Structure formats: C-alpha cells, structure tokens
Amino acid sequence: MRLVVCLVFLASFALVCQGQGYKGPYTRPILRPYVRPVVSYNACTLSCRGITTTQARSCSTRLGRCCHVAKGYSG
C-alpha cells in the first residue's frame, strides 16, 4: 500500500513539475527580460597597441572609436 501511495505521489509530482498536472502560475518557467550586456569602455584602449586590424574594426563598430593612431586604421 505504501508503495502505491509513493508511486502516485511521485507521478503527480512529475506532472506538476512538467506543468501538465497543475496550470497555476508557479509551474511555468520564469521568463527573464533580455538584458543587454554592459560593454566596458576599457575593452578597447585608446592607443590600441597590440591588437589586430580586425579587433580595431570591432572596437570602432561597437564603441564608436577608431584606433587609427597606432594601427593605421582609419575606420
């Protein structure tokens, strides 16, 4: 008898966890709002020493600054 009660409890718990047995507000996954990642302005240095031209272009595109002084990239 205990085994039957235990199996029924586990089956009902599994249905609740899947959101099929109980359609309340707490069985659904919580949707988090999309948060844009914060880009550090220190990711691209002003002197741009030691980075490739591709990285300089990426910095120019993302941050709106060009690394033309050290790399010769005019953006």
Curated annotation (Swiss-Prot):
GO molecular function: chitin binding
Entry keyword Secreted: no
Provenance organism: Penaeus setiferus
Residues with Serine amide modification: 74
Cited function: Antibacterial and antifungal activity. Presents chitin-binding activity.
Stored Pfam families: Penaeidin
GO cellular component: cytoplasm
Record-stated family: Belongs to the penaeidin family.
Signal peptide: 1-19
Main location: cytoplasm
Keywords: Amidation, Antibiotic, Antimicrobial, Chitin-binding, Disulfide bond, Fungicide, Pyrrolidone carboxylic acid, Signal
Name of the molecule in the record: Penaeidin-3n
